[in-house]
Amino acid sequence: MNWPIHGSNPQYIYNHLQLPMPKNIIDFSVNVNPFGPPALLKEKWIRWFAAVSDYPDPNNSELIEVISEKEKLPRSSILPGNGGAELIGLLAKMFSGKRVLLIQPTFSEYERMCTANGCQISNLILKENDWEIPVDDLSSKLARADVLFLCHPNNPTGIIYSEQLLLQIVNACQQQDCFLVIDEAFYDFTDESNTIASYLKDYNMLIIIRSMTKMYAIPGLRLGYILAAPSIIKELHQNQAHWSVNALALLAGKECLLADNYINKTKTFVSIERKRMVHALQQAGYLVSASRVNFYLVRDPELGDQLPLFMFLVKKGIVARHTANYQGLNGRWLRFSIKQTHENDILLKELLAWKKKS
């Protein structure tokens, strides 16, 4: 049996496998905040409804002002967009025909969008279990690259790297006249600071992507932003469609960025639940990635390909994210998000049952 094509809706998986869809499904493949959107969004939603009758601000002025204050960066260094996917697409267009280096395993959208824009793709595939970046190997590859994409924290492993290593990488890129794009879609789930956004003023070839859909659980609204040198922001903005960010997303985005208590509550919960799950799974004999965010990789070392475990869970109404299409993982791991405690308990129960069964 082949791996099913992963979709954003579990229905695609059950259809592909020709299995009846259980009445109750827990989708662990989606990495959004288990608490759902901040409560203030629901409270203000009706008041915001009038905004759908007007065109949104094409300059995103108020949202940019909030981001500027939060990041302590000039407004000219900020570009909001219709989610991380649109922003990756804008970057791929700017880098059209260039040589792009990807550190694998990583988010597949970089390769998809860059390939669509005629880029030449090369890969640095990290070794399993620790997924450390070999700086010497990376430096030699940078000599033949115009752009490096780094997903940090990494998706799908959840691994983070030290500020010292990140600065080594950005310095190596700068010396090779190579752009460094860091996708920080999950940076705000970690316990510690893991961003080098404050160094943007020192590195004119550093570009940072931020997604707001993950932490704030608003993937249906689509919102994110890029932090970069003003010259880069200007070029990207020229290629961006007018009214790229809708009016409701602009209003919600401002509220989300001010929801500090919500972020702190999420970080604490995710950290506690992740540590609990990882400990229990390791005790049961599973291998687990050293994630620091709201998802983690799991592997039954008694299996090569994890398809049997994936199928076992699917039949129980539990959907994992398989890794068959991640270079360097090739189906040997499954990814699970952190959800509410009772849902995590259901997953743990079934994973323990699998080990007893096998």
Where are these regions (language model features)?
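Conserved PLP-binding catalytic core of the aspartate aminotransferase-like
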Residues: 284-316
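Short, conserved charged micro-motifs
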Residues: 39, 303-310, 342-346
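PLP-dependent enzyme catalytic core of the Aspartate aminotransferase-like
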Residues: 315-318, 325-358
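PLP-dependent aminotransferase-like
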Residues: 6, 93-150
